[in-house]
């Protein structure tokens, strides 16, 4: 195994050191009036002095890894590589927030990130919607908006990855700057406004990736025993969700979501109707009882009228805001139960400013707040929704997760699956195995033998 790991490391180092990368000058804009050609990976922005420092540090780690791997087995080297990213990650804090985000997506798209080779502990595995998740920890929408890096992100050890939000027509989103760090509080404020390359570009990318994943699945199936429920998604290893949004200027929201279903659902293991971003005017009004019911009916009909194989159509979820009243939650729960919605994601970012950020001047920026200060609000709402839906609908807990204990609290409150984004932005790749390891300890500490046993434990 050491020999294979050494070969893999050497190949990775060569690619990193010698691959020529096309550059995209910082601040360059795309033309919204035309659909850009799909590419397998995003352009890397021009490196500033800080960017060159970051690159140099990463190259140094690659060289050190090459020297270390010759004496380590694959699993040991894998752990070392994830831990080594802790050295690189602080350099991202020196960069502009959106530039750092683009750089991270570019790295993941090119495979310049650690790849998890160690199998997940059996205690973390669970079945949802007829799919086997190797672990319940997923990456929320917003990181890989345009499906540029799904393979690299899934390879890092997430149980599932959600891309988007994807709008029908390309749009730039709101003016920059639009992402703001509150580092002391472990939070971010964003007002991106559904910046998206559009469904045509994303569909091309997902189609190309779909073919690769199918090949990987075929290879894995031929070498493993058959099972009634296969691990991974419909088109290969890893579960892929697609989050759908509406265009800012669209007058028919339902038509936008239906267009997303028609173009992207064949590549998705689940679909998400995003009606909760605070950065698109009027979007959150779609969470009202009548509006949501009408919208979900139209989207379900569009999905169900398509031709599906034995696996059937992808599950349909709705992502809701954390700033809802008890009455609004009751209305959403009633719609979800009446229409047999497949799941809810709780929650999106908040427009409120909890006491934890009140002394930070950045908190006055307009936009949705995510990260640690959102944890209590989103978890309390998750707990309420589990009660209102009587535990009959799978819930994805999202908001403020930055540790295994946080993920465990979400699960006990009623989450079947858990997502993170801001925690990943601050913690980097090393946070993924750390959360899974801590989650296992939490489960074993309280005597649970599986994730399923712990779901909703606070209600029993």
UniProtKB/Swiss-Prot annotation:
Keywords attached to this Swiss-Prot or TrEMBL record, sorted alphabetically, are: Flavoprotein, FMN, Membrane, Mitochondrion, Mitochondrion inner membrane, Oxidoreductase, Pyrimidine biosynthesis, Transit peptide, Transmembrane, Transmembrane helix
Cofactor binding note: Binds 1 FMN per subunit.
Cofactor(s), by name: FMN
* Transit peptide as recorded in UniProt: 1-32
User: What InterPro entries has UniProt attached to this entry?
Assistant: Aldolase_TIM, DHO_dehydrogenase, Dihydroorotate_DH_2, Dihydroorotate_DH_cat, Dihydroorotate_DH_CS
Q: Which family does it belong to?
A: Belongs to the dihydroorotate dehydrogenase family. Type 2 subfamily.
The question of whether Transit peptide is a record keyword is answered with: yes
Q: Which residues form the active site?
A: 277
The residues that hold FMN are 141-145, 165, 243, 274, 319, 347, 371, 400, 421-422
Q: Where, subcellularly, is it found?
A: Mitochondrion inner membrane
A GO cellular component annotation here is: mitochondrion
Q: What class of enzyme is it?
A: oxidoreductase
According to the UniProt record, activity depends on pH as follows: Optimum pH is 7.5.
**Which organism is the protein's source?**
Arabidopsis thaliana (Mouse-ear cress)
Q: What protein does this entry describe?
A: Dihydroorotate dehydrogenase (quinone), mitochondrial
One GO biological process this protein is involved in is: pyrimidine ribonucleotide biosynthetic process
Which residues does the annotated region (Disordered) include?
213-245
Q: Per UniProt, what is the membrane topology?
A: Single-pass membrane protein
Pathway where this protein functions: Pyrimidine metabolism; UMP biosynthesis via de novo pathway; orotate from (S)-dihydroorotate (quinone route): step 1/1
**What's the stated role of this polypeptide?**
Catalyzes the conversion of dihydroorotate to orotate with quinone as electron acceptor.
Q: Does the keyword Ribonucleoprotein apply?
A: no
Q: Where are the transmembrane segments?
A: 53-69
Q: What is its EC number?
A: 1.3.5.2
User: Binding of substrate: at which residues?
Assistant: 145, 190-194, 274-279, 348-349
């Amino acid at each position: 195994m050491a020999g294979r790991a050494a070969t893999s490391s050497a190949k990775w180092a060569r690619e990193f050191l010698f691959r020529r990368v096309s550059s995209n000058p910082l601040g360059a804009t795309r033309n919204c009036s035309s659909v850009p050609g799909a590419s397998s990976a995003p352009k890397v922005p021009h490196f500033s002095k800080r960017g060159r420092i970051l690159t140099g540090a990463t190259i140094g780690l690659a060289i050190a890894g090459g020297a270390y791997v010759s004496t380590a087995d694959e699993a040991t080297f894998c752990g070392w590589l994830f831990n080594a990213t802790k050295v690189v990650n602080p350099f991202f804090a020196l960069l502009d927030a959106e530039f750092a985000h683009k750089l991270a997506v570019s790295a993941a798209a090119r495979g310049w990130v650690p790849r998890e080779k160690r199998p997940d502990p059996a205690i973390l595995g669970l079945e949802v919607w007829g799919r086997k998740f190797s672990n319940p920890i997923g990456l929320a929408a917003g990181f890989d908006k345009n499906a540029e890096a799904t393979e690299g992100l899934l390879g890092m050890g997430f149980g599932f990855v959600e891309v988007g939000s994807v709008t029908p027509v390309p749009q730039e989103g709101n003016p920059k700057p639009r992402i703001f760090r509150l580092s002391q509080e472990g939070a971010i404020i964003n007002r991106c406004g559904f910046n998206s390359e559009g469904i045509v570009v994303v569909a091309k990318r997902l189609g190309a990736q779909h073919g690769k994943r199918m090949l990987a699945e075929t290879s894995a199936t031929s070498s493993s025993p058959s099972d009634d429920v296969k691990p991974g998604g419909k088109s290969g290893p890893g579960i892929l969700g697609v989050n759908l949004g509406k265009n800012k200027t669209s007058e028919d929201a339902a038509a936008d979501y239906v267009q997303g279903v028609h173009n992207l659902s064949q590549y998705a293991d689940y679909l998400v109707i995003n009606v909760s971003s605070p950065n698109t005017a009027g979007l959150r009004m779609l969470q009202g009882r009548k509006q949501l019911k009408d919208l979900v009916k139209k989207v379900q009909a569009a999905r169900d009228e398509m031709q599906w194989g034995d696996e059937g159509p992808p599950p349909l979820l709705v992502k809701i805001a954390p700033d809802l009243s008890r009455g609004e939650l009751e209305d959403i729960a009633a719609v979800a139960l009446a229409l047999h919605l497949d799941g809810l994601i709780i929650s999106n970012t908040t427009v409120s400013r909890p006491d934890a950020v009140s002394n930070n001047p950045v908190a006055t920026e307009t936009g949705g707040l995510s990260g640690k200060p959102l944890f209590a609000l989103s978890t309390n709402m998750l707990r309420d929704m589990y009660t209102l839906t009587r535990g009959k609908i799978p819930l994805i807990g999202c908001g403020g997760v930055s540790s295994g204990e946080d993920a465990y609290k979400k699960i006990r409150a009623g989450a079947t699956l858990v997502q993170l984004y801001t925690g990943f932005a601050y913690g980097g790749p090393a946070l993924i195995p750390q959360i899974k390891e801590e989650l296992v300890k939490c489960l074993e500490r309280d005597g649970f033998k599986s994730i399923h046993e712990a779901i909703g434990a606070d209600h029993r």
